[in-house]
Swiss-Prot record:
Gene: fetC
Positions annotated with a glycan in the UniProt record: N28, N74, N87, N112, N194, N198, N265, N292, N438
Pfam families: Cu-oxidase, Cu-oxidase_2, Cu-oxidase_3
Lipid bilayer topology: Single-pass type I membrane protein
PROSITE patterns: MULTICOPPER_OXIDASE1 (PS00079), MULTICOPPER_OXIDASE2 (PS00080)
Keyword Cytoplasm: no
Residues annotated for Cu cation 1 binding in this entry: H80, H415
Compartment(s): Cell membrane
Topology feature Cytoplasmic, residues: 571-592
Name of the protein: Iron transport multicopper oxidase fetC
Protein's GO biological process: cellular response to iron ion starvation; reductive iron assimilation
Enzyme class, UniProt record, top EC level: oxidoreductase
Presence of the UniProt keyword Protein transport in the record: no
Amino acid sequence: MAVGFLLLTAFVVNILTTSAATLHYDWNITWVTANPDGQFERPVIGINGQWPPPVLSFTRGDRIIAKVHNALGNETTSVHWHGFFQNGTNHMDGPPSVTQCDIAPGSTFVYNFTVEQSGTYWYHSHTKGQYPDGLRQALVVTDPKNPYIGQYDEERVISLSDWYHDQMPTLLKSFISISNPTGAEPVPKAALMNDTQNLTVAVEPGKTYLFHLVNVGAFASQYFWIEDHTMKIVEVDGVWTHASEANMIYIASAQRYSVLVTMKNETSQNYAMVGSMDTDLFDTLPESLNYNVTGWLMYNDQADKPTPALVSAFEPYDDFNLVPVDGMALHKEADYTVTLDVTMDNLGDGANYAFFNGITYVMPKVPTLYSVLTTGSAATDPAVYGYNTHPIVLKRGDIVDIVLNNDDAGKHPFHLHGHTFQVIARSEENAGHYDPSNHTTFPSIPMRRDTVIVRPQGNFVLRFQADNPGVWLFHCHIEWHMDSGLAATFIEAPLDLQKTLKIPEDHYQVCEASGTLTAGNAAGNTKDLFDLTGQNVSPAPLPAGFTAKGIVALVFSCVAAILGLLSIAWYGMAPITAPRAGSTPSNDSDEN
């Protein structure tokens, strides 16, 4: 199915004549029926009865007022504006139980903030497991001071994603369960490009286009390339970079790139654009799954859409080598270092969970931001935020290093809300834990972004300044891992936040409708802030001696035993039929 690019991917911005404005959005979040891969029709989450949701275009300095009404009926919802710093508007960031309450069915939440950045972003639900069901889309912020103004003729937006046929509540129930003790993530059913397959994008010969690339998927990173065309990377995650040529890019879930691509001067043929899911992430490789999605640059409507050529190896550009245009130098030595070790393991309910330093994230009874605002001087003590939020309190202005050691055999894209960070070190695969006494020289002008990959059994070091008071999640952006607990909470300058931030009354009304507490510690205790009795916690640890393989063996042994007992019971309850008079009992032997 060909899709007209004007509907999904293209907008031409006369950037020199635009000015900041107040943009109003009135969104009704509803269920819609869609079949984006042409294989399976299913319910998806749309906006105002439409799916895919609209690609948004802002100008730097715009004020956004988005009224979000939950008309789903059977699920709560939320909207996270991915990549926006929300400096001074932490309560508009979007994650439920972190900076707001869940928007219950029938409730309306108003997001009201000013856009202070430019580049490529996206918006998506941050309610548990929800955005892969469709509530996600690209967002682009233009800027008259964009360093590449005048070097391109038009802009295009290309989203990449994986796609599932089952809805997320069903998938999550089986994923986080005793029947999946190894934590094998569900494998997608398809890859999509702009929420479809066989996308066509009309181009004109000789023109240069600025392509905004966004991975809005739940799980799969994708390799992306355009046959017989060179891309020049000029932006990652809202950070403009010096142009770097690339033939292939690796885009993890939540990452964004802007690339300049100059068209050929002839129109005899069209060229394939390919997104290829990284199958290293998958525990199983279904024979029926096409890991690739193809679109085409259409120079000539009458010419064929060629089948992409096979590639002998995936060799993407290494984003560590990118250099920001603004020349921000390496921050000074860290005032505070946070070391996070990533593991996957089972807890007492038999299910597999994800951990930072042995802690799996569990949402508190009171949103963490609301705890900050209602605990007075105790807000500087991590204990009030609950053990399983993995709280880390930062002082304003401190330089912070995040040292992450990946003890897992898979890749992980990690995202920090409220900031971009300098990526000052990143190891190869199987390098083990970071050794501060034995590392290469840090780059003088490090690459910055808000989502970065750690390699299997590898490590990285991120550095940022705590200059944005707020409550900011740091989490894996593979949705399966986020939902199984791979998250921590940075509480940045909490006492400053108390002086400057006020929650709007309509936000409290949303909390009341959802039955969410809005004051006190993580357990909702307002009298004794250090009494966490009743706080939400993870399942108890697994009894000593149990392993994932042991659980599998135990589960199947129990199933086999139950089936055996049922068979015996069924046989024992069956009626015994005596031979009729005059009949001859059967005899299996063959006698003559």
